[in-house]
Regions:
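Active-site-lining helix/loop region of Rossmann-like oxidoreductase modules
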Residues: 148-280, 284
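A structured beta-alpha segment of the ubiquitous adenosine-cofactor-binding alpha/beta core
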Residues: 17, 22-89, 93-98
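Short, ordered loop/turn segments at secondary-structure junctions
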Residues: 93-94, 112, 119-120, 144-145
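Rossmann-fold dehydrogenase core element
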Residues: 131-144, 165, 169
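Single conserved hydrophobic/aromatic residue that forms the stacking wall/gate
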Residues: 1-19
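NAD(P)-dependent Rossmann-like dehydrogenase/reductase catalytic/cofactor-binding core
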Residues: 261-317
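Rossmann-fold NAD(P)-binding glycine/threonine-rich loop
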Residues: 94-106, 118-137
Length: 317
């Protein structure tokens, strides 16, 4: 996180990549494989990256690219309490099932609100939702949407087909990128929940089942020279009036990390609102607006309106 003027401040960050830990966050931002576009000068704030638990967070392609830190692991709960962290954001590599749940439990033990940006089902899992409800701590999740990304545009176009009376027969979404997220996703065994999350996010906007063979959505390949850019190729094939074929195909080009950052900041703000209001459990409206796999799926228009009502205090969650 960047230190900002609106009250969002850096706290301790945990990490496992190559650079020697602890390291100042402002230096870690450009270390090793971090290759996004620079859009701001970030002053040194004294915030350091500390050595967290790895568990299943370090996949095959990470091991081939960077060395895991040899620094001793910190007591995550103790560090969260010492830094007086109010909201913990989970932004681990795709496939970090065990690690994501470890940090979710750390949030509960440290008394933090939790924002789950990963396609690991926590907010949308009843057992975990009940844990946060019992602890009186809010959670926003699961699996962050980008500001304008492949999933949000694909959802809207699928819904547009249905709203305009065009029967969607089949669709695909192919994504390529050059950051470590895409390199990590070459390990297909880590993608099960990611594919489920992205697919269900799109198909949830339809009131009929396309069938598994007619939907293909997921990361496709790693192209190193793209750096932090992501290119998405989306196609929708349908039938309009008189069963006449109607097809739509488009390409989306974005810088992946900033496209996500603007959304995660608002998710953090909503989590803090929930914490201030002493709301425990999943925040349904912000989760549906900011996440691909929320506990409850609304249309994007409904989710936006409900989130505004939540912020204004007109809706509990």
């Amino acid at each position: 996180f960047f230190q900002a003027e609106d009250g969002i401040r850096d706290r301790d960050v945990t990490g496992v990549q190559t650079c020697a830990l602890p390291i100042y966050l402002v230096d870690a931002m450009w270390a090793s494989e971090n290759n996004t576009i620079k859009f701001a000068d970030v002053p040194k704030s004294g915030v350091t990256v500390l050595r967290g638990k790895t568990l299943d967070g370090f996949g095959k392609y990470y091991k081939q690219t960077v060395k895991e830190s040899t620094a001793p692991e910190v007591d995550v709960v103790a560090e969260l309490k010492a830094a007086k962290v109010e909201v913990l954001i989970c932004y681990l590599p795709v496939g970090s099932e065990e690690a994501a749940k470890f940090y979710a439990q750390c949030a509960i033990d440290a008394g933090c609100a939790f924002v789950n940006a990963l396609p690991v089902f926590i907010a949308s899992d009843k057992e975990w939702a009940d844990k946060f409800t019992k602890a009186g701590l809010p959670i926003v999740g699961d699996d962050i949407k980008s500001q304008v990304g492949a999933t949000i545009t694909h959802r809207i176009m699928a819904k547009l087909f249905q709203d305009r009376g065009v029967h969607l027969d089949r669709t695909y979404q192919l994504n390529v990128g050059g950051n470590m997220d895409f390199k990590n996703m070459l390990e297909r065994d880590r993608l099960e929940s990611k594919k489920i999350s992205k697919t269900n996010s799109v198909t949830s906007q339809l009131d009929y089942d396309l069938g598994d063979k007619n939907v293909h959505i997921g990361p496709s390949d790693y192209i190193q020279w793209l750096d932090d850019r992501k290119w998405a190729y989306v196609r929708l094939e349908g039938r309009a009036f008189g069963d006449v074929p109607l097809n739509l195909e488009y390409k989306l080009e974005v810088w992946d990390s900033p496209n996500s950052a603007g959304v995660i900041i608002d998710a953090l703000r909503c989590a803090k609102i929930g914490l201030d209001r002493k709301i425990g459990g999943p925040l349904l409206s912000p989760s549906s607006y900011f996440m691909k796999t929320p506990p409850v799926q609304y249309t994007d228009e409904q989710a936006h309106d409900k989130t505004e009502e939540f912020i204004a205090g007109k809706l509990e969650r």
